[in-house]
Amino acid sequence: MVVDFCRRFVARSLCIILMKHFCSSSVSEDLGCRRGDFSRKHYGSVELLISSDADGAIQRAGRFRVENGSSDENATALPGTWRRTDVHLENPEYHTRWYFKYFLGQVHQNYIGNDAEKSPFFLSVTLSDQNNQRVPQYRAILWRKTGTQKICLPYSPTKTLSVKSILSAMNLDKFEKGPREIFHPEIQKDLLVLEEQEGSVNFKFGVLFAKDGQLTDDEMFSNEIGSEPFQKFLNLLGDTITLKGWTGYRGGLDTKNDTTGIHSVYTVYQGHEIMFHVSTMLPYSKENKQQVERKRHIGNDIVTIVFQEGEESSPAFKPSMIRSHFTHIFALVRYNQQNDNYRLKIFSEESVPLFGPPLPTPPVFTDHQEFRDFLLVKLINGEKATLETPTFAQKRRRTLDMLIRSLHQDLMPDLHKNMLNRRSFSDVLPESPKSARKKEEARQAEFVRIGQALKLKSIVRGDAPSSLAASGICKKEPWEPQCFCSNFPHEAVCADPWGQALLVSTDAGVLLVDDDLPSVPVFDRTLPVKQMHVLETLDLLVLRADKGKDARLFVFRLSALQKGLEGKQAGKSRSDCRENKLEKTKGCHLYAINTHHSRELRIVVAIRNKLLLITRKHNKPSGVTSTSLLSPLSESPVEEFQYIREICLSDSPMVMTLVDGPAEESDNLICVAYRHQFDVVNESTGEAFRLHHVEANRVNFVAAIDVYEDGEAGLLLCYNYSCIYKKVCPFNGGSFLVQPSASDFQFCWNQAPYAIVCAFPYLLAFTTDSMEIRLVVNGNLVHTAVVPQLQLVASRSDIYFTATAAVNEVSSGGSSKGASARNSPQTPPGRDTPVFPSSLGEGEIQSKNLYKIPLRNLVGRSIERPLKSPLVSKVITPPTPISVGLAAIPVTHSLSLSRMEIKEIASRTRRELLGLSDEGGPKSEGAPKAKSKPRKRLEESQGGPKPGAVRSSSSDRIPSGSLESASTSEANPEGHSASSDQDPVADREGSPVSGSSPFQLTAFSDEDIIDLK
């Protein structure tokens, strides 16, 4: 009876999983085309702005980037009926001010040295725990005249780490002399000053009131009082404070003698103190028409808000109306009293780098609190971006160079005198000198005491980078994961979504996994799969089984696999797949796949230093029918593939991705990485051209991600800690154009990633114990989350990863308290290194869960509101399990379904899948039940999937060492989501109920703790 019950339970689970295959939402098609596509036009376009006086004479002109969203007022949704989730502070201080957060007041080492060019540098190193997550790691800061570089290095109790190896990881291998350790505790004050050169933690913004028809700055600054709407706007920005006796951040205003006015507007936002220089609150002089005192403050603000009254048709404000060489960003605010909404327009000086968040379409806000949050974030990000302009960057570089050289001159004499305490250049960092233990402990205690005093002084002064815990900010972030399968017992190698289930390659074989239902075996362990692609639109499964020299590519029909699962067949073995292998791919170590734009499937297989181009023979649109879907399991799609050509390279590629040409008739490209370079290869001619050369002794290639900016291909080249964006210029007369572009940019990750996922507007880097999230357009950091034992397994549509936590079976309070006590700055340890608990304590077991970040959460909530379905008719075929062919009908999809419609569709779909429906003919209102698999298959036969559907994936790469399993899932994904808005079973992908997500990647504490317990 027990056996029969288990069989019935597994059969029921299998039935539920198979039903979900056909319940994919059409949202995926809308999101897929957005994932890898991005446009800088969302961030404005550069215009020449000319201002004139009342007589029409030209006064001034300037080039500014203008952001005004879209002028389309006929949006499908009214402004204010949605909530943005892409409003983030870029490079937030609580993530970037490392020295204050992780070093100051803690035991750490500081070193001084000269590079090969005899320029001095400083290095700070500490070993810290990532917020009691039992993830010890090294943090290092390199201070140079060009700026600071920050990296994290993994901690290993068995592997020694020297200063030389840390500098080598920062690409600094040559020195004039070996670095020497600085023991003087006062060095902490000097290094804190160096970090403060990155910019102020607090901000001052100008607020200028302009009446209707005012065209010059003299007229605007001469407004003695504001209007009622202007006062309402000031109340929205912050609190009105009395300057005399004010003890908070004053923003350059006089708080003793009232020489800069009696009142001002002040607020605190996410730990930042903000003082507004309001024109009507600054001193007014009837004799001075130019109002010099007002211009002195507002004219010296980097960012100024201009509140302009009047109708939309009246002459609008232009930055050239203001005579200021210092103000780089103007935010034009208009208030509509009739509709009670605000309209926003941003002007940025041409040299200011792009910054977010992009304005919505249309840029109108009816939710005033949402408008305040958006405006403050935009202004803070704008001032930070302005500091990266050549003018400010050169000043900061000169100041930093002067401070470093001055500090170097002051310290060198003391270092030469105190040779007894000098440590060897190659000393292991965690070890302290065995001799004079008591003296060393006393020195460390004094070192920590002085550091804590400096930290307290900065906090009292208001210059400390505060955490979000003090700001009360609590919002759901788009990257918040959901638990897909708890207590996953296997080691995942790679995976790919199949409908709403997940096809996972594990150490026990390939399994079909969905939620906490029992896993269904598809292939046994004799077929060790390292890469896979589930192509539902083509009814294909492509995978690479790696078994030494016998490695090959295998192709299967999904319908045949599904039929076998319905028949409760055991998992296929390698011997059962003889008819499904592509013989010429023997010995392959990597492959990449591409289906966007093209009418045919393209696969490039790497066999040592040889590339083999394979395509699938083009099927006619009528080729995909219900009859072909029910073909026998023995029928293999191998005969449908043809070998086009072979291309020989100079070395075996470690990373490979396919790039579409700029037009249908243009040559497609292959980007490969080997040795110390990234090359692009013409698929037609086999010619290879250098794209980028890596200047480093050791190179760890991570990914080459193809993205498309306004239809033009670009590549994100990722290696070591670096990520570079380069435009891919088309072939011209047989030659490849390699030239620098103004759109190219480069940034560094804080921790070396093993996988990168692009989901516009975000770039997600996966490391062994953290997730780092940046923006595609500028590489700015928006979030860092600690995720112990993080392993990415799939990213082609939704992102799936596993994470391991130490779950205490008895109590979770003791270990947490112990970790806190160990890290308390009040009790400095007697060694150079704090003692960390082991990854698993006594009475604890490993718990590995499978998590999911829905793609629609990342790419579906930015720019437009709401996301609109393409208004085109599509031909829909019935779900696969129905054996009777049904007539196809054109259907226009809509994302706005009521709850009753969703339930009705789900119920009708379930009845038809189980063969309980008496109606064989289709109905127009039932069309959404024919989910994405049959629809996409027919779209492919008629001309391929929608452009851009797979554009945001990380490239295929060779796994290395322990990172093999996570990185192979990066293979050029196909952009459709496995999630569904229309399936009640999949309702978990929306806003999860309390407790549905085991941890949240949101900023609640100093390091945004993720609790996996």
Curated annotation (Swiss-Prot):
Q: Name one GO biological process term.
A: regulation of small GTPase mediated signal transduction
Signal peptide span: none
Q: Low complexity bias located where?
A: 811-821, 952-962
Which residue windows does the record flag with biased composition (Polar residues)?
963-982, 993-1003
Its domain of life?
Eukaryota
Q: Does the record carry Transmembrane helix as a key word? A: no
Q: Which UniProt keywords apply?
A: GTPase activation, Phosphoprotein
PROSITE patterns found in the cross-reference section: CNH, RAPGAP
Which InterPro entries does its entry note? CNH_dom (IPR001180), Rap/Ran-GAP_sf (IPR035974), Rap/Ran_GAP_dom (IPR000331), Rap1_Ran_GAP (IPR050989)
Q: Does the keyword Nucleus apply?
A: no
Residue ranges of the region described as Disordered: 810-842, 913-1013
Which Pfam family is one of this chain's hits?
Answer: Rap_GAP
Which stretches make up the Rap-GAP domain?
Answer: 191-407
Residues annotated with Phosphothreonine modification:
827
Positions carrying Phosphoserine: 45, 426, 432
The record's comment on protein family reads:
Belongs to the GARNL3 family.
Its protein name is GTPase-activating Rap/Ran-GAP domain-like protein 3
Q: Which organism is it from?
A: Homo sapiens
Taxonomic lineage of the native organism: Eukaryota, Metazoa, Chordata, Craniata, Vertebrata
What would be the name of the gene that encodes this protein? GARNL3
